[in-house]
Structure formats: structure tokens, C-alpha cells
């Protein structure tokens, strides 16, 4: 049997969990993989945690200037890595650089997409992709506006987070394993917003979660899973607030927690899949993949701080009653 040479590029931490079982499967089938990953957030820690061999190429930029400069530099570096590899197919999830390099080198590319509001990323990538795999809740016309070929789009029922749990084994002792000092009977896991992302205009030294934490810390244990150091510093020194240091078993944490409040996307959808009550306070436009879980009554969404606090407190008092969506 002739094996395929497959290039997978990982540019964000959640993509590690998405691809880990894909990588394992392809390797078990005897395919030849080359995996690249940029140095951003917890990507490298997660890659090592899941024992994935990879080549580190490039890093993340904060300002528009830095984003453009770092992405351009990463393309330049990746071209030299990939050019002599004789790659048969390239695979990524929201990587900016892979579709551009694959197109330039004549490599067929497969692109996984779940954010129809990522304006810059979608404009730069979708016109260049041979196949685009996307949830069927995303309006194809929106992708076509970015230049996607409608004949290249492969829709599916669900969201990409389902892949995160293919080999998931729940650890009921996760709180003890992390030696958490829990003061109250109820525990809330929180995830701040992706304030460094190009699709969100946010201050990385502030968080929409701060006023929520200030109130709820008097009623429940608060666990914060920050995305980067400056975000962790926002919550340092606050009584009854534990800042988790990645990498940790976030899936078990979500399942063990009584409530999840997230200002991002991935963890909220993961919590919905695990059927842990979840409140989304994502400060951007509602994504179709979030609406998918909202419509099923598995996620509550609000940007009203008082409403979020009220819903959370009501749930803490009456945990057996479903959050009123």
C-alpha cells in the first residue's frame, strides 16, 4: 500500500484536541504525517501532553502590524519546510498560512471552518481551499461572500467540538488531582474571551468576566482558565478564585463543574456537549455553531452582566432546575 504524505498545520490550542484523534487514526493507517504548529498560547504544551511530534514554526502577533508581519514570516518559513516534502494533501482548521502555501505549491488542501465571522481569515483562505468542511448550520452564502467555491463546501450535522471527545475518559477525581481548595459546594468554571484573536476587538488586559467574578465568588468556587499570562493577571489575588495553569484536563473539569461561564466559544460548546449547564457571554456576534446549541436548549447566551449573574445565582440555589433559556 502506498502511503500519503499529509501536512497538518495547527495554529490554535483547541485545534490540538480536534486533530489529536485524526492524527492517531492516520498514523494507524500508515500515512506519513508532517505536523507544524505555531508558538501561541498552550499549543506546544498540549502537543506534548498528547505526545504529538511537531515542528514549531512561527508565532502569534498582537497588533494588526504584528499579525501581518508574523503571518508573512511564518509563510516564508513554512515554504522552506514543506517545499521538499512532496506533500499529497494539506489539512488545517482556520490556519491562515496553510491554504496560501498549499495553493502556491499546488498541494490540494482540506480546510475545517466553524467561524463565519472571521472576516480577515476567511477572505485570505477560503478562495484558495479545494475542500471546506463546515457545520450545516453555517450559511453557505456567507462563505461564498468570502470567495468560497460552493462546490467545494462539505456540510455536516454538528460542530467540530464533537471530535474532542472521541477518546475522552472522564476523570471524576480531577478536582483532587489538581489539589483544589474549594470553599463552597458549587464550582463555576470560567474561560475569558479570545482577546488576541483577529476577529474580536478586545483589550487583552481586561475581561468581560471581571464583574461576574466579583459577585459570584461570594457564592461559589471560581476556576479561571486563562488563555495567556496577561489574562491570568487580571484575576490574580482575588479571594476564592483559582487560576488554572494549562495544560489541564479541561474536559473532565467541565464535566465536574456545576456551571460553565465562557466568554469564548470552544469551551462553551464542549460544555454543551457534556450537558454541563453553560452561559455564553462571548462579546462578539453569535456564531451559527453557538446558535446550534442555544436552539437545543443546551446553552444560554447573554451580554447583560446583571442577567448572567441572576441566571448563575438562580442555578446555584436551584441546581436541579434547568437554566431558563
Model-derived segments and spans:
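Donor nucleotide-activated moiety binding/catalytic core segment of transferases
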Residues: 74-81, 229-267
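A donor-sugar binding/catalytic signature common to diverse glycosyltransferases
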Residues: 90-101, 111, 253-290
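A nucleotide-sugar donor-handling region in carbohydrate enzymes
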Residues: 133-204
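Short acidic-hydrophobic, aromatic-tinged amphipathic segments that line or gate anion-handling sites
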Residues: 55-56, 154, 242-246, 299-308
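Short internal beta-strands
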Residues: 33-39, 223-227
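Catalytic binding pocket for nucleotide-activated donors in carbohydrate/polymer assembly enzymes
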Residues: 273-320
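Active-site and donor-binding regions of nucleotide-sugar-utilizing enzymes
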Residues: 9-17, 25, 39-48, 53-147
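Catalytic donor nucleotide-activated moiety binding site of glycosyltransferases and closely related
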Residues: 50-62, 190-192, 213-244
Amino acid at each position: 500500500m502506498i502511503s500519503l504524505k499529509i501536512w497538518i498545520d495547527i495554529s490554535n490550542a483547541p485545534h490540538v484536541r480536534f486533530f489529536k484523534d485524526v492524527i492517531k487514526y492516520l498514523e494507524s493507517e500508515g500515512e506519513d504525517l508532517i505536523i507544524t504548529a505555531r508558538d501561541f498560547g498552550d499549543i506546544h504544551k498540549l502537543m506534548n501532553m498528547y505526545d504529538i511530534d511537531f515542528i514549531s514554526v512561527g508565532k502569534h502577533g498582537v497588533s494588526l502590524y504584528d499579525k501581518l508581519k508574523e503571518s508573512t514570516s511564518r509563510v516564508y518559513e513554512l515554504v522552506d519546510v514543506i517545499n521538499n516534502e512532496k506533500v499529497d494533501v494539506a489539512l488545517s482548521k482556520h490556519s491562515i498560512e496553510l491554504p496560501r502555501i498549499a495553493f502556491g505549491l499546488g498541494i490540494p488542501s482540506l480546510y475545517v471552518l466553524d467561524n463565519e465571522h472571521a472576516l480577515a481569515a476567511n477572505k485570505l483562505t477560503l478562495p484558495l481551499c479545494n475542500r471546506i468542511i463546515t457545520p450545516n448550520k453555517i450559511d453557505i452564502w456567507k462563505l461564498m461572500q468570502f470567495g468560497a467555491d460552493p462546490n467545494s463546501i462539505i456540510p455536516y450535522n454538528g460542530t467540530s467540538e464533537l471530535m474532542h471527545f472521541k477518546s475522552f475518559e472522564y476523570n471524576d477525581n480531577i478536582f483532587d488531582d489538581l489539589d483544589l481548595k474549594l470553599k463552597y459546594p458549587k464550582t463555576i468554571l470560567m474561560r475569558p474571551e479570545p482577546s488576541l484573536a483577529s476577529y474580536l476587538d478586545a483589550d487583552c488586559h481586561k475581561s468581560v468576566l471581571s464583574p461576574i467574578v466579583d459577585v459570584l465568588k461570594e457564592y461559589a468556587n471560581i476556576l479561571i482558565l486563562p488563555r495567556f499570562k496577561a489574562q491570568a493577571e487580571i484575576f490574580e489575588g482575588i479571594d476564592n478564585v483559582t487560576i488554572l495553569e494549562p495544560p489541564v484536563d479541561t474536559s473532565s473539569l467541565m464535566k465536574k463543574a456545576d456551571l460553565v461561564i465562557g466568554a469564548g466559544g470552544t469551551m462553551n460548546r464542549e460544555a454543551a456537549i457534556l450537558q454541563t449547564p453553560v452561559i455564553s457571554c462571548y462579546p462578539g456576534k453569535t456564531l451559527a455553531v453557538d446558535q446550534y446549541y442555544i436552539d437545543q436548549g443546551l446553552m444560554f447566551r447573554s451580554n447583560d452582566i446583571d442577567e448572567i449573574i441572576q441566571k448563575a445565582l438562580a442555578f446555584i440555589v436551584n441546581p436541579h432546575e434547568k437554566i431558563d433559556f
